Amino acid sequence: MKHILFISPTTSMDNGAEKSVYYLMKYLIQLGHTVINVTHAIGGEPQDKHEQLYKMIGVKNYYLPTIKWWWPDAPGGEILNREEATSYYRQNVQVIAEIIDKNEIDLVISNTVNVFQGAIAASCQKVPHFWLIHEFPKNEFAYYADKIDFIEEYSSELFSVTGELNNFLTPLFNKKVHPFISYTDQETKDLKKGNQVRIISVGRLTEGKNQLELIKAYKALNRLDIELVFIGGWDSKYKAICDEYIHENKLQKNVKFLGNLDNPWEEVTDRDICVFPSSMETFGLVYVEAILRGLPVILSDNLGHLTAFEIFSAGQIYKLGDIEELVTKLEQVIESFRDFSDRAQLDVERLRSLYTPEVAYKEILNGINHLENTGHQNTNLSHIKELLTLNMHPTRLERYARLISNMATKIRHKLRL
């Protein structure tokens, strides 16, 4: 049995990449492996909840302080002080290397292309490293297209979500990119009873998730007797755009935002229609969660949704951007809701037989079971480890100057806003 260290991209469970690998960790522990996870510190109640969630499945978490956890040019905030951010990057590589030694780690796995510290630490310690890719190098993740050589160089094995993403990435790498299916636990608990039909969309409110398209379709549907409910946190700027449209069209009483919930499916009833209008997905894990609960689903035809749809053949597909077609699909499901609901519930047993961790993670599990054949990354950084991990200790005067510089940078940033 192996000691496996994961590097996680976020300290939350509001995205498919985290959910999928959480259940991979859970399954690996069931098989007898030891699993440890490293992510960035966010403090407070959210971190406490996160830690408790992982303790429930037997995973020890390390929470590392940082200015920015992802690559400097990745989405997720601007770095105001590059020197300080670089110091944290270097410090965290050192801490991860120490965790590898202390826990006798056999394998490091980086979840998403957005985190790179584990790849460097693994190379410094001469430990195999797997990289799991969930993102197309397009739109908000286009930044990593010029990092493909690094990703390949510092990976013993590469894996990506199956289907369109894997097809897209395969010609970009010299190494084989092994496929895997994003997995989530199969909920066997019955949905609570609802009083009336509602339209539900689960997931973070973002431009990529494209909820404004659903709001526009809802206005065109002109069924104010049916609520539109969004479950999930939000990006403030995109939420403001949605709010503006809702107010302009006097939909405030009919459109609800419930925010981030620990278990969003506890809010969903057996009278709900799930709609997922995302413009870009790598798989569509929330779609799978919905159909496994026997809910009628309408989803856009983005590449990730199509990958999942090809596996499960459940739900209704509409052409992304075609609001008129989305309205037609909504009208059809509302008009014949009982028929659509009955068919969805009868299909659950078939869907569950297609969706098991053994099948979803077959290639990753095979790589772990034959780790002795994978070797290390192409590049060995152990000879220059100290250059990459040791920070100079500043004098008191230098610390004071850095503090003044940070304050000035923050003031300039606020003045630009």
Mark where each language-model region is.
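Glycosyltransferase donor-sugar binding loop
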Residues: V38-P46, V202, E227-I241
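A conserved mid-protein helix/loop that constitutes part of the nucleotide-sugar donor-binding site
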Residues: N15-Y23, V197, T206-A220, A240
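A charged, aromatic-enriched C-terminal amphipathic alpha-helix characteristic of glycosyltransferases
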Residues: K189, R338-T395
